[in-house]
Amino acid sequence: MLLCSKKLLSIVASITLLGSYGMVAAQTNAGSRTNTPQAFNPQDPYNPRGTLLLRSPLNQAPVIAPNGPTPETIVGDPAYGAFQRGWYLTALALATRQAQAGITSSKTLLGVLYESGKGIPRDLPLAASWYELAASDGDPQAALRLGLLYLSGAGAELKADPEKAAEQLEKAAAANIPEALYNLALLHQEGKVRPNDPKIIKSLLERASETGDIDAMLELGIYLKDGPQEIRDPRRAAFWMGRAARRGLVPAQIYYATLLFKGEGVVPNEAEAADWFERAAAKGNPIAMNRLARIYANGRGRPIDTIEASAWQFHAGRQGILDSKLEALSKSLSLEQQEQASKRAAEIGIKIGASPVLQPKQ
């Protein structure tokens, strides 16, 4: 069982908020989902059979973990303050002086500056060297960043080294940093430099989930649902998917809706499933739009409403989710009904930021 796919973050573009990383895209694999299901039954919201990809937290200056070194407290660190204000050359000068004086957080900040290329030429080997110094001092955030650099690599400039990545991620995972726990689960899943042990993978994802990491919650739910038989637990899978759904993660909302609809790990509740599909559809997810359209077309979880079904499927179809039965339903509408569906689709389009135009049947 492979855990579901993640977006690979660009480290250059991700320097605004520490700990904020790429969620599963709201339309994961939507473009490839053009086949029409044979029977009405909400399916998986996206293909969970891909491979976990690197998730990077490199989004601002480093924050020292509670059990990490705290030289002079980072709040009063002038280099950190300059970085946050966008004064990168000032931050570089201050951090260099402080790093030479042995301040660990400044070594990590230098790594961030050289890795991101903010205000200076990007230099990944130099970034790695500063991270290594800070990690040796005991900074788990530096260990995380160094581990992610070795995990992804950068061609000839910095070769990927999964073994070194695992070593550093283990240091960061010991401080319960969710990105480290998540990516360490990746390495165990791959089974090359660390054993593919379902119990270890489950434990790492559980620890990441318990920190409040919603992506890990979804991954854990998928793993408990579809992973190796020895660790499967439908009820716990539904629990974690539901928790991620309630925190706003769109793919989790679709997964949880599917579980509610089918009664897997939870008491069947088609009406509640419809509510979750609608939440995800309102955020622009085409898979959810299609599932909601089916619900309206078949009267399961909501009263039959061919106008709503046609309007929602219009938007799903525009994003590549084709459904021959729903398309046939739309074509069977009277001219008046098509006009109503067009008006409703326009209302939905405003809500989700699209500009639909349905042409009435001639």
Where do the model's predicted regions map?
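Bacterial N-terminal signal peptides
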Residues: 10-20
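N-terminal leader/linker segments that initiate helical-solenoid repeat arrays
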Residues: 23-108, 354-362
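Terminal, low-structured helical/coil segments at or just beyond the last alpha-helical repeat
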Residues: 38, 51, 56, 63, ...
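Short helix-capping/linker turns of helical repeat alpha-solenoids
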Residues: 68-75, 86-87, 100-104, 116-118, ...
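Hydrophobic face of amphipathic alpha-helices that form TPR/SEL1-like repeat modules
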Residues: 75-81, 109-116, 147-154, 183-190, ...
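Structural signature of tandem alpha-helical TPR/SEL1-like repeats
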Residues: 85-90, 121-130, 157-168, 194-204, ...
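Alpha-solenoid helical repeat scaffolds
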Residues: 96, 125, 132, 170, ...
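TPR/TPR-like alpha-solenoid repeats
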Residues: 113, 134, 149, 172, ...
